[in-house]
Amino acid sequence: IAGGSNNEFMAKAQFWLGNELVDRGSAIAVPISADGSRFSAAGDSRIEQIIGQLHASHTLHDSKPLLVGMSSGGSEAMAIAALNPHAYRGVVATPGRIKTDTALQELNKLPFYIRVGEKDDFKWDRILESMTQRLRLAGAEVNSAIVQDARHVFQIDWESLENWLGKLK
């Protein structure tokens, strides 16, 4: 999921992660908001519509979708999942953050895989522990870690991620 203004630049920034996921057998969509509005706005059904279109046009597993994003895309994936935790299989945010003013409902053991660079340009490493605690208090199952020596954008530890993905229901 591309976050921020959801423009073409953000979609391209998500592309390498998406390519890796496709190479590993996933179907992906990188949505772009034409008007720059966030997909996590209350009442916004565009993500559900995109997922429906993917199922209508491709042969996919019937399992719930996994929301994945990096940077503001990771933050947006987390915010979307927090609005409707029953609709998703989990969230991968590498990195991502949930804003402190975001209301969290019961997350019903929704799995989150969150990684933030030790030298994050936006200092998200400083909030990872409190964010993890907040998500857990809301009922999420959180696998979070600081990536040593990494900045805001970093290489994914695919062995760790695939191990986590293998445990999803």
What feature does the model see in each segment?
Residues 113-115, 121-169:
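C-terminal catalytic histidine-bearing segment of alpha/beta-hydrolase fold enzymes
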Residues 57, 63-109:
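Primarily recognizes the serine-hydrolase "nucleophile elbow" in alpha/beta-hydrolase
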Residues 1-39, 122:
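Short substrate-entry loop that stabilizes the transition state in hydrolases
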Residues 39-71:
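Gly/Ser-rich "nucleophile elbow"/oxyanion-hole loop immediately N-terminal to the catalytic nucleophile
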Residues 8-13, 40-42, 79-80, 103-104, ...:
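Short, solvent-exposed loop/turn and secondary-structure capping segments
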Residues 10-19, 45, 49-50, 95-105, ...:
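Alpha-helical scaffolding within the catalytic cores
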